[in-house]
Regions:
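Ligand-binding beta-strand-loop-alpha-helix segment within the catalytic cores
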Residues: 62-153
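N-terminal glycine-/serine-/threonine-rich phosphate-binding loop
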Residues: 1-50, 54-60, 72
Length: 153
């Protein structure tokens, strides 16, 4: 029986730079296309925490205006989707399969008064030592939290 399958990829599984990400999504495309070849309909979702942080850091230059987080999120969705779409399309073509692949950039509506903003629970960006995280928090006002034993972000 053919099914609609949702595949979720974590942002941390997508690599730390564009070259690494292209290789990882190329590898990921193989089992995804296996499912498409079996007749299943796939929806892919992905994380982007590290990528949003890397984009934000790229604008950390006094000569360049800062990039707001919503735009960083859209940029990360765009380039991650671009890499996924290309890798899946290439794998489909290699197998002689003509199947459409599309990328959708999403938006989220939030209430700025939501008390959850006072205690963020989803860290993004690069990992830092506790000392460096405290320094960044003091300089920027960002909330820095320990993340899964991997450091602070």
């Amino acid at each position: 029986m053919k099914k609609r399958i949702v595949v979720a990829l974590g942002g941390n599984a997508l690599g730390n730079n564009a070259e690494e990400q292209r290789e990882l999504v190329r590898q990921t495309a193989v089992p995804i296309v296996d499912l498409i070849a079996e007749g299943h309909e796939l929806v892919l979702a992905h994380g982007n925490g590290p990528q949003v942080g890397m984009i934000n850091l790229a604008f950390d230059n006094p000569n360049v205006p800062p990039m707001p987080f919503p735009e960083c999120g859209a940029m990360s969705q765009g380039y991650i989707g671009y890499h996924l779409q290309n890798a899946i399309r290439e794998e489909l073509l290699q197998r002689g399969l003509n199947h459409p692949v599309a990328t959708i950039v999403t938006q989220v509506v939030v209430d700025i008064e939501d008390p959850a903003f006072q205690n963020p629970t989803k860290p993004i960006g690069s990992f830092y030592s506790e000392e460096k995280a405290k320094e960044i928090a003091k300089e920027t006002g960002f909330v820095m939290k320990e993340d899964s034993g991997r450091g602070y972000r």
